[in-house]
Amino acid sequence: MSVDATTVRRIAHLARIAVTDDEVPHLQGELNAMLAFVEQLSEVDVEGVEPMTSVTPMQMKKRADLVDDGEITDKVVANAPASEDHFFLVPKVVE
């Protein structure tokens, strides 16, 4: 698989990146090099290799899933123009 100049311009347009005509050949080469690397990865034999999420054997540190107000509700609503019982008061939008 290879990327042509039209595809480079289309990708740049979709990414909202301004690319000059002088930059297109360089970007085309870069994208083709990335795709070649990905193609090399697909050729690697991974039969019998266990899936892993990290190269280091460590357990995820988990915390208890508790509902908490953060103990800063007064600071949070202090900046509000109007509040009541730790809730923001906003003007009515729909009549």
UniProtKB/Swiss-Prot annotation:
It catalyses: L-glutamyl-tRNA(Gln) + L-glutamine + ATP + H2O = L-glutaminyl-tRNA(Gln) + L-glutamate + ADP + phosphate + H(+); L-aspartyl-tRNA(Asn) + L-glutamine + ATP + H2O = L-asparaginyl-tRNA(Asn) + L-glutamate + ADP + phosphate + 2 H(+). It is an enzyme of class 6 (ligase). It holds the Pfam family GatC. Its EC number is 6.3.5.-. The keyword Transit peptide does not apply. The keyword Protein biosynthesis applies. GO terms for molecular function: asparaginyl-tRNA synthase (glutamine-hydrolyzing) activity; ATP binding; glutaminyl-tRNA synthase (glutamine-hydrolyzing) activity. It comes from the Bacteria. Keywords: ATP-binding, Ligase, Nucleotide-binding, Protein biosynthesis. GO terms for biological process: glutaminyl-tRNAGln biosynthesis via transamidation; regulation of translational fidelity; translation. Heterotrimer of A, B and C subunits. Belongs to the GatC family. Allows the formation of correctly charged Asn-tRNA(Asn) or Gln-tRNA(Gln) through the transamidation of misacylated Asp-tRNA(Asn) or Glu-tRNA(Gln) in organisms which lack either or both of asparaginyl-tRNA or glutaminyl-tRNA synthetases. The reaction takes place in the presence of glutamine and ATP through an activated phospho-Asp-tRNA(Asn) or phospho-Glu-tRNA(Gln). This is Aspartyl/glutamyl-tRNA(Asn/Gln) amidotransferase subunit C.
